Swiss-Prot record:
The lineage of its organism: Bacteria, Pseudomonadati, Pseudomonadota, Gammaproteobacteria, Enterobacterales. GO terms for molecular function: amino acid binding; ornithine carbamoyltransferase activity. Reversibly catalyzes the transfer of the carbamoyl group from carbamoyl phosphate (CP) to the N(epsilon) atom of ornithine (ORN) to produce L-citrulline. It catalyses: carbamoyl phosphate + L-ornithine = L-citrulline + phosphate + H(+). It comes from Salmonella typhimurium (strain LT2 / SGSC1412 / ATCC 700720). Belongs to the aspartate/ornithine carbamoyltransferase superfamily. OTCase family. One of its GO terms (biological process) is L-arginine biosynthetic process. L-ornithine binds at residues 168, 232, 236-237. This is Ornithine carbamoyltransferase. Its EC number is 2.1.3.3. Pathway: Amino-acid biosynthesis; L-arginine biosynthesis; L-arginine from L-ornithine and carbamoyl phosphate: step 1/3. It is found in: Cytoplasm. It comes from the Bacteria.
Amino acid sequence: MSTFYQKPFLKLLDFTASELTALLQLAAKLKADKKNGKEEQKLVGKNIALIFEKDSTRTRCSFEVAAYDQGARVTYLGSSGSQIGHKESIKDTARVLGRMFDGIQYRGYGQEIVETLAEYSGVPVWNGLTDEYHPTQLLADLLTMQEHLPGKAFNEMTLVYAGDARNNMGNSMLEAAALTGLDLRLVAPKACWPQAALVAECSAMAKKNGGAITLTEDIASGVKGADFIYTDVWVSMGEPKEKWAERIALLRDYQVNSQMMALTGNPQVKFLHCLPAFHDDETTLGKKMAEEYGLHGGMEVTDEVFESAASIVFDEAENRMHTIKAVMVATLSK
């Protein structure tokens, strides 16, 4: 696709609304072609570097399977398998990898790292997650929403994000709403709201596209009429333990449970989560949370909601691969 050819994919606001629509259409086509055994390989002979300073199941598998489906080869560089930022500057790493690879995925820390890779590598660079943004996740979310509300435009959909909205997911949701005109409600304590400047910028764009962005602490009004309720983990492995109690106390009331789902007044409301989710006591961290804070049966979402018919999280997870494939095909093939 000439519009995207050789361009980086760093954050959603680097693109127009029509470009975002084109990517979603390509993802839907690639998904259908794969399922119908009609996929055409566009990336034969391409070499792709996958830099992971932060581990991930979905992102790594999505990039690898998408690349293999399209005939490309991948090299995985984990946190212990590269010198990036330690013995070699990001700028130098970018220039080395750019001579060997046709595209580079980065999942890690600051947004400035992925931007430096894009500036100096000379090849398309894709943001698999940074501290500030998670654009590939939002592509998967938008495709999933389209699939579950066929025939509805985004500016006719209401998406609620409940929990900690000051993270990369909150930022990328704001950008998605700006481009698509979603009715986006960030339902969170004020301490967990995103930066005001980004909210203002995205709100103005969303309004022009027929949507609205609302920030509220009030759960009942915030979720009323929602088509989708979304949440993410409250604590991550590796965060200082002293932050856990503070975060849980702040967010406990914003757990997605059957009561919150009922408050929407929409019997067809769906549940989204970027995963992994602490919805039971079957993980190391989930067990710790249950034992230390009494969060049995789920932290940010209850097991009841996660395992219910309303949950479309595994459709969403599958769509990571199809949308990531669309990004690679769009940026690496003419």
